[in-house]
UniProtKB/Swiss-Prot annotation:
Part of the 30S ribosomal subunit. Contacts proteins S9 and S11. GO terms for cellular component: small ribosomal subunit. InterPro entries: Ribosomal_uS7, Ribosomal_uS7_bac/org-type, Ribosomal_uS7_CS, Ribosomal_uS7_dom, Ribosomal_uS7_dom_sf. PROSITE patterns: RIBOSOMAL_S7. The keyword Ribonucleoprotein applies. Gene3D superfamilies: Ribosomal protein S7 domain. This is Small ribosomal subunit protein uS7. One of its GO terms (biological process) is translation. Belongs to the universal ribosomal protein uS7 family. HAMAP family: Ribosomal_uS7_B. GO terms for molecular function: rRNA binding; structural constituent of ribosome; tRNA binding. Disulfide bonds: none annotated.
Amino acid sequence: MSRRHRAEKREINPDPKFGDLVVTKFMNAIMLHGKKSVAESIVYGAFDAVQSKLKQEPVTVFHSALDNIAPHVEVRSRRVGGATYQVPVDVRPERRQALAIRWLIAAARKRNETTMVDRLCGELMDAANNRGSAVKKREDTHKMADANRAFSHYRW
């Protein structure tokens, strides 16, 4: 890791349809091989499907899903005197959001619906209702942190 310069954070523009920065970050995470228009159509298609099924505003469903997925604590490895301990640490807000987005996309890609729009729609609705594999990932992370609470005094 270079000690000379820290890469500065880039400004991102809010998405054109909802004017939300988090939706733009989500689109950028969905995007593969620089194909932004494909990512846009996937996200907006999933949002339209959520709106038609739940009769709710899709952005509020999206934000509640992210809140249900985002972890509060995680474990980090810390080496102390030849032993490696899994130390529970609090998660910074930016990392919480990034992990929630990453886990939501990974869970959607693992689902077995035919199109990515359907997978994403299903995972968003499941996560908003505290179900689904993305929420399970968060629960597992919290369980790991809870099981290793004895090592929390090694926190740095």
